[in-house]
């Protein structure tokens, strides 16, 4: 059963400027394994984190670093939740997040479906 759907878009150039202006933003938003990615990938991952939050009803207390986009070579990206995000997802009955990412023409897009088993 679908618990929630979230969609977000991020202007890559604007996101890059924000990160350049506020370097600590990377630490607040991304885990160690995410921070060294190119701006397009970071923007798409931030859109994914926003989409996860929306799929959960925009809960208070969600820590951005607790939502991680993981991708192994040759596989599609997946959402992993830890800490605050895991607690919120568990309380909502979410068993799996389905993720679609794209970036084109300077815009990064993410769609997330939160599903129970």
From Swiss-Prot:
Signal peptide: none
Enzyme class: transferase
UniProt keyword list: Cytoplasm, Fatty acid biosynthesis, Fatty acid metabolism, Lipid biosynthesis, Lipid metabolism, Magnesium, Metal-binding, Transferase
Alphabetized InterPro entries for the sequence: 4-PPantetheinyl_Trfase_dom, 4-PPantetheinyl_Trfase_dom_sf, ACPS, Ppantetheine-prot_Trfase_dom
Presence of the UniProt keyword Oxidoreductase in the record: no
Membership in a protein family: Belongs to the P-Pant transferase superfamily. AcpS family.
Protein name: Holo-[acyl-carrier-protein] synthase
CC per GO annotation: cytoplasm
Function summary: Transfers the 4'-phosphopantetheine moiety from coenzyme A to a Ser of acyl-carrier-protein.
